[in-house]
A protein has these predicted regions:
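Active-site phosphate/pyrophosphate-binding segments
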Residues: 174-346, 351-354, 439-475
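Glycine-rich phosphate-binding loops that contact phosphosugars or nucleotide phosphates
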Residues: 78-254, 449
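Glycine-rich phosphate/diphosphate-binding loops that line cofactor/substrate pockets in enzymes
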Residues: 50, 72-85, 138-147, 266-277, ...
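C-terminal helical cap and adjacent loop that interface with cofactors, partners, or active-site loops
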Residues: 385-451
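Gly-rich Lys/Arg/Thr-decorated short loops/hinges at beta-loop-alpha junctions or inter-strand turns
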Residues: 51-61, 117-122, 313-314
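Extended, charge-enriched "interface" segments that sit outside catalytic cores
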Residues: 1-81, 361-367, 371, 459-475
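Short beta-alpha connecting loops at secondary-structure transitions
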Residues: 122, 206-213, 317, 369-373, ...
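Helicase-primase coupling helices
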Residues: 318-407
Length: 475
């Protein structure tokens, strides 16, 4: 239940405008009223399925369950802020994309470049790749005396994350001794599974537990995301409150009043009836740029599944594409207006930006640019959104708009929960498990084999044979 007033919740409510998904707006490539009516029984079943599994979907309970750990989160954040000038996250997938997205959304867009007295919180680096040049570059720009690392892996065995941990731990022990690790290293992991929890206990590290039943791509509202957000100065209670408010909205059985179910329903109809196997997410705000990265993992990893039914292999999934308004008007929108009808475009518009910049009168004698003077960049970006929405619509391409009154912790919490609920409903509509990722395991096992992990000898032989076959077509 939201701690904010009813009036505030209504004022800051994230809304969806789906009118441009319909045939009456975009023509023959849009969704018809009949298609929606035909899908309503499936939508009702999807809603019932999600509600029945509510207790199993532990991520959905986070707005309530994580309140009890907030004192520990805030204490750790205060420690980091007092100790460090730099906060580094070692993680990959949801352990990285969520913290990046929230940090970008809620902090100064050039946060790391600000002088420390203006930043008021440590610089944030999220190391989500094992490119050796990148790791070497990070070590060139940080002062370990004033750096705290947070290693995040639920399994405690993620190769990319644990390799980075080995590098950082060796460096820290060499400089500060084993007793100094606690001042520079935080662990976020499972309460008992995997290798990291044992390391954390051995060295008495500050440790945060990822709750049972919360997968990486659904983990932003637990310590995976909350610690980094608190270090950055975010009001994490408002973030959770916003998510809880959206969960309430998505608990309505009426599809026309349930934003998550409506989004899922329209995307599935678009995919099944109109061949829209691509979904573009295009926020018109630099602050939301990396929400598209986080959403891409959520949507792709949850719905990209293979099932065998009646002897037939069925494949599901819609390919997410990241875009940014207005930047990608000059790189992608040509495709979205004149290209094939194989995609939906989801815009995110912002009612009020936190800053605005006036366009001054300078070249009033040049009519081709003088018309811009007297306006502001806020007016310009809003006009460009409306213009692009119009262009995509009149070209006959399905699109919709997620409307954020402004970008703050409460509205961002709503957006996170909205996308998570949309994904859960979509999984039920398709009849698939949206919470596993079996397709990822093959690559993990191959990596283990190539690096000599015991027990993967047969996989190594398989890889060698594949290499021989591949040589036949190398130019």
């Amino acid at each position: 239940m939201s701690v904010f007033s009813k009036e505030y919740c209504e004022k800051m409510r994230v809304r969806i405008d789906c009118g441009n998904m319909l045939a009456e707006a975009v023509g023959k490539h849009g969704i018809t009223a009949e298609e929606i009516s035909e899908m309503l029984p499936r939508a009702e079943g999807a809603f019932a399925g999600v509600e029945k599994k509510r207790g199993e979907m532990r991520w959905r309970l986070l707005p309530e369950t994580q309140l009890e750990i907030l004192p520990a989160v805030e204490e750790a954040a205060e420690f980091v802020r007092s100790k460090a000038d730099t906060f580094v996250i070692l993680g990959i997938g949801g352990s990285a994309l969520g913290p990046i997205a929230v940090h970008r959304a809620l902090n100064h867009l050039y946060h790391n470049d600000l002088p420390s007295e203006k930043r008021k919180s440590p610089r944030l680096f999220v190391e989500d790749n094992v490119d050796p040049e990148r790791k070497a570059a990070l070590l060139d720009v940080i002062d370990t005396d004033r750096t705290v690392f947070n290693v995040i892996t639920k399994s405690g065995s993620t190769s990319e994350t644990m390799a980075q941990l080995l590098i950082i731990t060796r460096m820290l022990i060499d400089r500060y001794g084993e007793e100094g690790l606690r001042d520079h290293l935080i662990a976020t992991t499972d309460k008992q599974k995997g290798n990291l929890i044992g390391i954390a206990k051995k060295y008495n590290l500050r440790t945060f537990i990822i709750p049972d039943g919360v997968g990486g791509r659904f983990s932003e509202l637990c310590p995976v995301g909350l610690v980094a957000a608190a270090v950055g100065g975010a009001d994490v209670r408002a973030l959770l409150a916003g998510a809880g408010y959206m969960d309430e909205l998505c608990s309505n059985a009426d599809v026309k009043k349930n934003p998550g179910l409506m989004l899922a329903l329209l995307e599935i109809i678009a995919a099944e009836k109109h061949g829209a196997n691509i979904g573009v997410l295009m926020p018109y705000a630099d602050s939301l740029k990396f929400m598209a990265d986080w959403y891409a993992q959520l949507w792709a990893e949850s719905l990209g599944k293979k099932l065998v039914k009646d002897g037939k292999v069925l494949r599901f999934g819609q390919t997410p594409v990241k875009s940014l308004g207005v930047t990608d008007q000059h790189s992608q929108v040509q495709l979205y207006t004149d290209g094939p009808f194989d995609k939906t475009i989801t815009f995110i518009s912002v009612g009020k930006y936190r800053s605005d910049v006036a366009v001054p009168h300078v070249f009033d004698d040049i009519p081709g640019i003088a018309f811009l003077s007297g306006h502001s960049l806020g007016e310009l970006i809003s006009a460009e959104f409306r213009a692009t929405e119009h262009a995509v619509t009149v070209s006959g391409h399905m699109n919709k708009n997620i409307i954020m009154p402004e970008v703050n912790e409460f509205t961002l919490g709503q957006l996170i929960m909205l996308f998570e609920m949309q994904t859960a409903f979509a999984g039920e509509l398709l009849g698939i498990d949206a919470f596993d990722q079996p397709g990822v395991e093959e690559g993990k096992n191959a990596t283990y084999a190539l690096l000599g992990k015991p027990g993967y000898e047969a996989k190594l032989d398989e890889l060698k044979n594949a290499e021989e076959a591949k040589k036949k077509l190398i130019v």
